[in-house]
Amino acid sequence: MRSQKPAVTLVLAALLSACATPTRQTDATMVTYDKDTEYAVTPRADGFAVAINYSRYQFIPESSAVATACKSALTAIAYEVADKQGRKISPLNEQRIRISMGRNGLTGITSCSAMAVAEWQL
Protein backbone atom coordinates (compact mmCIF):
# COMPACT_ATOMS: atom_id res chain seq x y z
CA MET A 1 0.00 0.00 0.00
CA ARG A 2 1.39 3.39 -0.98
CA SER A 3 1.89 6.19 1.46
CA GLN A 4 -0.28 9.24 0.86
CA LYS A 5 2.10 11.55 2.71
CA PRO A 6 3.46 13.26 -0.43
CA ALA A 7 -0.05 14.04 -1.70
CA VAL A 8 -1.21 15.31 1.68
CA THR A 9 1.94 17.41 2.01
CA LEU A 10 1.37 18.98 -1.41
CA VAL A 11 -2.27 19.78 -0.62
CA LEU A 12 -1.35 21.35 2.72
CA ALA A 13 1.44 23.38 1.13
CA ALA A 14 -0.94 24.64 -1.55
CA LEU A 15 -3.54 25.63 1.04
CA LEU A 16 -1.00 27.38 3.25
CA SER A 17 0.51 29.34 0.39
CA ALA A 18 -2.84 30.35 -1.06
CA CYS A 19 -3.52 34.05 -0.91
CA ALA A 20 -6.00 36.47 -2.34
CA THR A 21 -4.49 39.06 -4.64
CA PRO A 22 -6.33 42.12 -5.86
CA THR A 23 -7.25 42.36 -9.52
CA ARG A 24 -4.93 44.71 -11.41
CA GLN A 25 -6.80 47.71 -12.77
CA THR A 26 -4.34 48.54 -15.57
CA ASP A 27 -1.45 47.15 -17.57
CA ALA A 28 0.32 50.52 -17.59
CA THR A 29 3.79 50.77 -16.06
CA MET A 30 3.61 51.70 -12.39
CA VAL A 31 5.76 54.39 -10.77
CA THR A 32 6.66 54.36 -7.06
CA TYR A 33 4.85 57.02 -5.03
CA ASP A 34 5.88 55.98 -1.51
CA LYS A 35 6.87 52.79 0.30
CA ASP A 36 3.30 51.45 0.18
CA THR A 37 2.05 52.86 -3.12
CA GLU A 38 2.74 52.70 -6.83
CA TYR A 39 0.65 54.35 -9.53
CA ALA A 40 0.12 54.82 -13.25
CA VAL A 41 -1.54 57.67 -15.14
CA THR A 42 -3.20 57.14 -18.51
CA PRO A 43 -4.12 60.31 -20.47
CA ARG A 44 -7.65 60.65 -21.85
CA ALA A 45 -9.32 63.31 -23.99
CA ASP A 46 -11.40 64.53 -21.03
CA GLY A 47 -8.73 64.13 -18.33
CA PHE A 48 -6.79 61.07 -17.21
CA ALA A 49 -7.19 57.72 -15.49
CA VAL A 50 -5.26 56.96 -12.31
CA ALA A 51 -4.56 53.42 -11.18
CA ILE A 52 -2.78 52.53 -7.96
CA ASN A 53 -1.51 49.49 -6.14
CA TYR A 54 -1.36 49.97 -2.37
CA SER A 55 -0.20 47.38 0.16
CA ARG A 56 0.95 47.28 3.75
CA TYR A 57 1.60 44.85 6.58
CA GLN A 58 -1.16 44.37 9.13
CA PHE A 59 -0.81 42.07 12.12
CA ILE A 60 -4.57 42.24 12.64
CA PRO A 61 -6.34 42.35 9.26
CA GLU A 62 -8.41 45.49 8.73
CA SER A 63 -9.37 45.56 5.07
CA SER A 64 -11.56 48.62 5.54
CA ALA A 65 -8.59 50.65 6.83
CA VAL A 66 -6.52 49.64 3.80
CA ALA A 67 -9.43 50.40 1.44
CA THR A 68 -9.79 53.88 2.95
CA ALA A 69 -6.04 54.54 2.71
CA CYS A 70 -6.04 53.23 -0.86
CA LYS A 71 -8.85 55.56 -1.97
CA SER A 72 -7.21 58.46 -0.15
CA ALA A 73 -3.88 57.82 -1.91
CA LEU A 74 -5.63 57.58 -5.29
CA THR A 75 -7.41 60.89 -4.71
CA ALA A 76 -4.21 62.64 -3.57
CA ILE A 77 -2.29 61.37 -6.59
CA ALA A 78 -5.04 62.52 -8.97
CA TYR A 79 -4.94 66.06 -7.57
CA GLU A 80 -1.11 66.12 -7.62
CA VAL A 81 -1.05 65.03 -11.28
CA ALA A 82 -3.56 67.76 -12.17
CA ASP A 83 -1.54 70.38 -10.24
CA LYS A 84 1.65 69.38 -12.08
CA GLN A 85 -0.17 69.97 -15.36
CA GLY A 86 -1.48 73.33 -14.15
CA ARG A 87 -5.12 72.25 -14.44
CA LYS A 88 -8.01 71.51 -12.12
CA ILE A 89 -10.10 68.37 -12.04
CA SER A 90 -13.70 67.84 -11.06
CA PRO A 91 -14.16 66.34 -7.60
CA LEU A 92 -13.66 62.57 -7.67
CA ASN A 93 -16.82 60.63 -6.90
CA GLU A 94 -15.85 57.95 -4.38
CA GLN A 95 -18.66 55.74 -5.69
CA ARG A 96 -16.93 55.57 -9.08
CA ILE A 97 -13.58 54.36 -7.76
CA ARG A 98 -13.09 50.73 -8.79
CA ILE A 99 -11.35 48.84 -6.02
CA SER A 100 -10.13 45.29 -5.51
CA MET A 101 -8.76 43.96 -2.21
CA GLY A 102 -6.58 41.00 -1.28
CA ARG A 103 -4.66 39.60 1.66
CA ASN A 104 -1.75 37.21 1.99
CA GLY A 105 -2.33 35.41 5.27
CA LEU A 106 1.23 34.10 5.47
CA THR A 107 2.98 37.46 5.13
CA GLY A 108 0.26 39.63 6.68
CA ILE A 109 0.23 41.95 3.65
CA THR A 110 -3.14 43.46 2.78
CA SER A 111 -3.29 44.86 -0.77
CA CYS A 112 -5.55 47.10 -2.77
CA SER A 113 -5.72 47.92 -6.45
CA ALA A 114 -7.88 50.88 -7.44
CA MET A 115 -8.68 53.02 -10.47
CA ALA A 116 -10.62 56.21 -11.13
CA VAL A 117 -11.09 58.67 -13.97
CA ALA A 118 -10.27 62.31 -13.27
CA GLU A 119 -12.04 64.74 -15.59
CA TRP A 120 -10.76 68.23 -16.34
CA GLN A 121 -12.88 71.11 -15.08
CA LEU A 122 -14.24 73.27 -17.87
Question: Where in this protein do the model-derived segments appear?
Answer:
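Flanking scaffold residues of small Cys/His-coordinated metal-binding clusters
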Residues: V11
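Bacterial N-terminal signal peptides that target proteins for export
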Residues: M1-V8
